[in-house]
């Protein structure tokens, strides 16, 4: 990387990191060279420099070294052009055509100019072509094709690509692009249309500017369509699309024109000619800008005052009233995050509800992106459900965040049990009052980064008035009035401060401190009044109350009460203020003061009388806005309270409570060591000899012998054979033995290589392992002697190795791990997982590191530039430094001791860490690794914090990338029992419960029964496996596209693992490691089949998805049957013999008749005589489906629903008509005209488009999922018809071809249908299928228009598959079938792709491409960790582990690719390469939006009141603005400080509580206390989104469970008949227990009993309990019939309310009715009261949205409640006692809807 982007300090920092890296690598290489490990060298390579990256990413081969030489000699700009020269001169090989030279030169040069950043040369440029100026002189010119995602490359890179393109054009001797007026006007239109219809451009050029650029840019800026928005300038010559070309628009507008000034610098530096026009453009623009500014200023001076006065005259609404109105009209509450609430994870605030989280703009020093900082007091008052690092689901700006502390934002305002109201702004106060809180009136501030609004493109909400806004208004007023320049958040010039203080009559020291730290230093209330009076600025926000929470009429009432209050007055600087206010304790007045957020207390003055006491300074805060009661407050229409105050009072107010945000708890924080399941200490196989605990020591003590699959090595010197790499006898490096699985012969590596790894005796592929006998006692004794470790309790190995080579770890490493109490991961490393938390600044005392040590590490000055001297100074974190949790420190200390022991006792080298305490690890290096990533990144430990998160720079977290597939990748899944091929984007949408985890969105909860098909390499079969979660992550800068033989292809991220077949086995490679010629599997697919005779249309249309049509679908032909069952229906239905489906379904329900009992009938639509028979025979239906997929389409209008088929041959049309009649009967018409057959029927239309989901047109048609599970005979019917329509049999060669514009349809047919017959095909593609249409071309030539281009795919069947096709399927027509006779006798060519497991096809071409979308997708397949995508290609998925850290030397010494599982996770989540130097430009672009300023300026707050888009606000500097400059690494500022980054709860209460019932009880208790939460809504949502789905899901799991052996853990689909494990004789047990199913039932029933939930929800719980009871009553002996106790009789109550009598026989509390030998109910018990006995059922209908309940102080169990009632006596006494309790209703305050009343 070039030196110019670092400061000297950062350069020294990176050099110091590299020195430590080199030191660690040198030690590891020395150790590895001894030959005791699988490889002689370290297996974790370092990432290359810029030149290396350029070569590996864009090529050409061999260019890296030349780039280094040229950059050193000329600098990167000239070097880029020199490389272009050399590429075009052929110095890097013959590339073929001019286009190839041009493309290579452009990409390589641009990669150099952008420092090897991937996004510009690869993501931005889709193609490079040489075209002709056909509309001019026919000369050749260069065209660059840009893609939509070019935006992420940045404007400078976009502009540079054009410049480089022009240079390449000149070198190739091409003419310039000569656009016609059509070209120019087309681009003018596109720029404007894109800005209006798609997204706002950062720079929207004027039409003339676009024309200027188009006429002068020497190359064509074009691209493929990115948006389906049509232009009016259509069919322009040379432009391939009539839609918007987003990439080209961005390059022209935001690249060339916006960055014109910067482009001029490059033009001059690189000496490129012909660009004088852009220099003139820049000069003209600068002149125009300055003259415009002068014009605006003079205009403002002349007319400004008049316009303001004119505006005032026209005002009819108050300012804040209008703002609220505008706010409500433009920004609606977002309820999405409340759709699901997990039991035990509270809702903290309803959407946009007053009293929830108050939005505060800013960034704390422990914030970066997707982070909220809140006051630690808020965490404590919310029952510690929020701890540092807890994840939350949020209303806006993004979907999720983690929580960090900030003590300089406001905490909660609470009412205590004694009636006092307290502002809890500090942790100490929170600790004192936490147990006394009665109601949380205001939750507190949520500090949200402006960059999060930019990233999520969320409209800015009006800012609430805060201290950082007020201090800027103070500074501005001092400047305007006294002409004294001061700066907020800074140490100001002392003289200037003293001058201002003298004018203001305040203490200079106070003013100096106030300006330096306005968030902590606050004026007393009298000074605040004085400053507002003197400077005419709003009242200080600390003393401003939530006035707009009240209605004007309520403030009127409050003022009247204050007029009768006892008030103690005082005076300061001639301003009167209240010192104390004593009010009568009126219920309404008390509530008004609470809603104002006014601290006060209740004081007893007489025996029963209490008064409200408001002390200083809050007495003044209350009365000052009311003018000290000197003017009368009167409510005014269309005015808020603050509007009225500002109209009448001399001291004005700003609203401190406009914008509120809702949130709920997500996942708790995490920090713990990574262990395999079960934990492992050495990767050494022991089989069953070690017992269930896999204890090698135990096996050795018992003298057992183990038979395991393991790699053995043979000493070439003395012949010793064993699992060791180094001979224990003579110390020679051994050779790997390759084993013949047939004859059992072993061959050393050198011999096996000569034999090409095939047995010379039997020609079988050799394996690097075999099942061998090992003696644990001998091996363990030898290992103990080697490292002198003896007294161990156990040594846990693995049952078997899952790696490809099955090489075992040295046992010595395991012994040393046991000694140090650490555990190994699957790749040989030791890891610690932690939740990511961002931090940009820290104090030495917060991380436990001394000032002296930090100076050694390069921290010489604090963030303000002062020398580091104290441990409380704030330092800016360097980008690759990390602060680990104490838990990590303690564990890594053990790891360091293990590494030292390993070096000393195993390798015989000096100890490295010598760490006695965890502070000794400071300065040492770690590798950070995130889930779905390939490359780790080097980090340096600088300290530890007492939290459960890993603090690191936002850049560091963003540098850990993910690997996934594009969203349009198709994947083979099973949905509700039917196989389907859907896109990954569609799969993601089939899951819910989205969480934001470590920069990726994760969903784990399926909406349907979804499984994925995987390939099992051991059995060679395709099997179903569960999906653990699906992932959506921001796309990387570019993707790799693999084109395989036979027309197959797929795309993935660069580091994604790919499964390839090599040396007789399946191995994983990173995508960038895959080479042309590597073989990838297309597996044999054998899906389970079931025979179906007919399709029941009545049953299909009775499904819920057609409920909206049930009144209109008519069932005909069942009148007699309806009479026979005495159905209660209208006589008219019987007379006409036509009944609505809705009525029939009601009859079936009432009569308890199943739909199968309804006799054969016909279906039609109301007022339509067309009828279709109910039972559709499958064979003719499939014939029609085949014709439909080939030649059919569906059409609908307001009154017409048709299926049409276009067929040329009469024989085929007759076959279709015959099939239609056989399938659907004679109740409809078939219309034939020319070669077209049409059927008019809405039933048939819905059958094909909605039931079968066969699509509507050529582009959307798909094979119905039902067909995939049918037997071959049935499928042949469909295929015969399909190939008759879309297929042809060629006469010239033995080949069948099917043509379609729909690739997905062809893939369905080939991969899932033809595969049933053992038939495979290959794909070809015609980019212009119309080229042979001479008449069509002539038509367009005559009119001067461009002929349309039709892209057509072809599925080809040849070779032996050709013969199979005709023998098993064939065509319908004799004409096509007869062609087979021409080739029947020809012997087919041998299938060279066939293998035992399927087809092995080679990689034909690899190319880097630009992603089409902003996100990529993946999933975690539970067992096999691979998936089947696109044309049946097997490839790996992503892994889903937590972010982890490991000591660098541990990874270098112990990581080996030979340990990585061949399946089950493979190479994912392993440090295959490590990035040594972080480049902010290359990390995830989300962090580029993080702001880096000390405070947000006044212009920003004004913009929020205008509800502007964040992208319109240019006054806040972000990381993006610094990219490519030294400042991108350092000088980052923050807006809000915190006293301590570790202040706050360390562990969420959620993790500390026990069972779900306890968690939900605490969750609801908190909901009852929070004013901004409706606890009844919470209860309802928990039941519907968590408890019921879990109950039902567990119930389903029980019926589908496997059985497990307790001894060897083998699982069986069905229990063995012997009742014992066939393998080891162990006991067989269930994998899903009864308790697991019932565990949430008590919680659910408690919720429906205590909280007002809908009847439907109660019914769901009743039905679920009944289902559980029914399942188990015959399976288990009934010891306890009901779990719920006294809260259980919900269903009994509902039955009684509806029928007037109790159905005790089927009730759920039979035991309480005296049945089954249980205790009988007492009439006065609480259970009786709940069931409704002893009183009339309520007639009042419960509303869908119940009113809020009275406050419930505690959640007591119902059993306890019943006992208390019995102790008090009767239920009547209990009721009376309850009624005497004081009742207080919660009040939400004022939401946006309530603000305006009804």
From Swiss-Prot:
NCBIfam families: intein_Nterm (TIGR01445), polC (TIGR00354), PRK14715.1 (NF011303). CDD domains: Hint. Keywords: Autocatalytic cleavage, DNA replication, DNA-binding, DNA-directed DNA polymerase, Endonuclease, Exonuclease, Hydrolase, Intron homing, Multifunctional enzyme, Nuclease, Nucleotidyltransferase, Protein splicing, Transferase. Belongs to the archaeal DNA polymerase II family. It comes from Thermococcus kodakarensis (strain ATCC BAA-918 / JCM 12380 / KOD1). Residues 1733-1753 have a biased composition (Basic and acidic residues). This protein undergoes a protein self splicing that involves a post-translational excision of the intervening region (intein) followed by peptide ligation. Residues 286-309, 1699-1798 are annotated as: Disordered. Heterodimer of a large subunit and a small subunit. Pfam families: Intein_splicing, LAGLIDADG_3, PolC_DP2_cat, PolC_DP2_central, PolC_DP2_N. Gene3D superfamilies: Hedgehog/Intein (Hint) domain, Homing endonucleases. The keyword Nuclease applies. This is DNA polymerase II large subunit.
